[in-house]
Amino acid sequence: MVTAYSSTPDQTDHTPFITANGTTVRDGIVAANFLPFGTKLRLPKLFGEKIFTVEDRMHPRFSNTLDIWFETRAQAKQFGVKITEAEIL
């Protein structure tokens, strides 16, 4: 399952623009609890050849989910929830 988030206080901790890995959020960042930081992946059915990097974590209850960072809450809501395959690089 793939979901989306943005840097709003209700979706993050007290440092909404810093990832769990200590980097600044940017396009191409994903949160995942089941992959190590730095893992590169693609979501070809949704984003073609675009490469994402795991730099963030989610609440522990989301064990097999990828959460894509979007710049705005509206973009994250528009993306919604998708079921797709991830290609680990």
Language model regions located:
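Solvent-exposed, well-ordered loop and adjacent helix/strand elements within mature globular domains
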Residues: 1-89
